[in-house]
Regions:
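Sequence/fold signature of self-assembling virion shell proteins
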Residues: 22-71, 78-83, 89-228
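Short, glycine/acidic-rich hinge or "gate" loops at secondary-structure transitions
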Residues: 1-20
Length: 228
């Protein structure tokens, strides 16, 4: 769908969502107002996912006034949690980031087989400053063609999505109901199934009848070099 969008549609999107988008390491320096392609041209190979950029995304998301991006959950001790969805290359960059590495080396529990929950030793999500970093391989395998040479010097770019409450909607058109198949051939063929109608998608909020802002999502466009 993104590949099918026209340059004008992409420009409208970045104009509407300029307050909830990070281009490389800086919006003030890299965002070209009203021009999506020109903005991505400012992303260099060094602008990869890191602990510092995750902190920046989280600060920016929490500072938004409307629509607010709220944490998707609060723990008993009052800590706030967001989820960052990224592709394989960005997850690799996060794993190799010194700040995230140090946090896992020095801040994780060691007793009671704590190593079994440490991503240095086992596969799974990364945790950093109240953000769950989750790898989504399909964000790499289905990366729109446009992104593959969109950055400075044909740098490969991939989006990462910091999500809070209401980042996506699951809408039911018809709730699940059972269905049965019966044949009169001595009851040798019997079956049961479910029928339902639903849809899943991102939510957008129309503000001032002008800007269609994404709800609950802060998007970063970062370098994501392929190593395959």
């Amino acid at each position: 769908l993104f590949d099918a969008a026209s340059p004008a549609q992409r420009n409208t999107w970045i104009t509407d969502n300029a307050d909830r988008v990070l281009i490389g390491t800086s919006n003030t320096a890299n965002l070209v107002a009203g021009n999506f392609a020109a903005s991505l041209l400012n992303v260099t190979p060094a602008m990869t996912l890191s602990g510092a950029l995750i902190n920046r995304m989280k600060r920016s998301a929490k500072a938004l006034l409307f629509p607010r991006i709220r944490p998707f959950k609060l723990k008993e001790n009052g800590t706030e949690w967001f989820v960052l969805f990224c592709g394989q290359e960005q997850f690799r960059d996060a794993q190799n980031d010194n700040d995230i590495k140090t946090a896992n080396q020095n801040s994780r529990a060691r007793e009671n087989q704590g190593y079994l929950k440490n991503p240095i030793f086992v596969d799974g999500d990364l945790l950093y400053n109240g953000v769950i970093i989750r790898e989504i391989p399909e964000l790499s395998s289905r990366l729109p063609v446009f992104y593959k040479t969109a950055g400075n010097g044909a740098t490969r770019i991939s989006p990462a999505f910091l999500c809070g409450q209401g980042a996506a909607a699951w809408c039911w058109g018809k709730m699940p109901t059972p269905t049965f198949r019966r044949e009169d051939d001595y009851q040798y063929i019997r079956g049961a199934g479910l029928k339902m109608a639903y849809g899943i998608g991102k939510i957008a909020k129309l503000t001032n009848n002008v800007n269609l802002k994404e709800w609950g999502v802060y998007t970063a466009f970062l370098a994501a070099a392929s190593d395959l």
